[in-house]
Design a protein with these regions (language model features):
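Conserved hydrophobic/aromatic beta-strand scaffold that supports enzyme active sites
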Residues: 3, 23, 44, 53, ...
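Short, charged, solvent-exposed linker or helix-capping segments at domain edges/interfaces
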Residues: 123-128, 142-145
């Protein structure tokens, strides 16, 4: 963000509430860009005992991940993850339980990750290129973002 959304003045960096923040230099305006993290939903989707990993069209050929998306106004996180699973995979959510909350600082996001038990036939939407059904014991978590949720989910399953 380079300009004030209220008065169009160029934003400047200054110390506010103990941190460097972008703000409007016009004292009459007073706009501060707080740059708060955005909540993102992630679904570790299990269908018929297998985990669904999906590849976004924008991702490299061998890169697969969990279903993710943003909440809509007025929905609970559980409703939001069920909607994302329906929209992206065409599956109906039978249950959604919180795995955990994870930082994704590279994108200034907070991930709310859910274990979703779903049913139906997979029908990918236009965002996704392909999917894979993986037995849980073959999952290999990565060390950031939604990979941390996979790690925690696998640890709970084995205990």
């Amino acid at each position: 963000m380079r300009y004030c959304p209220r008065c169009a003045s160029p934003l400047v960096e200054c110390g506010i509430a103990g941190r460097a923040r972008l703000s409007c230099p016009d004292a009459a305006c007073g706009y501060v860009f707080w740059d708060n993290p955005l909540p993102v939903l992630a679904g570790l989707v299990e269908r018929d005992g297998l985990v669904v990993l999906a590849r976004n069209h924008a991702w490299p050929e061998k890169m697969f991940g969990l279903v993710t998306g943003f909440m809509e106004r007025g929905e609970t996180p559980e409703e939001g993850v069920a909607r994302e699973v329906q929209e992206e995979l065409g599956l109906v959510t039978r249950s959604a339980s919180l795995i955990g909350i994870y930082p994704f600082q590279r994108k200034n996001e907070i991930i709310l990750a859910y274990h979703v038990v779903a049913e139906g036939e997979i029908a990918l939407n236009e965002e996704l290129a392909e999917f894979r059904l993986i037995p849980p014991e073959k999952l290999r978590p990565w060390d950031f973002g939604t990979g941390l949720a996979i790690r925690d989910w696998l640890a709970r399953r084995s205990s």
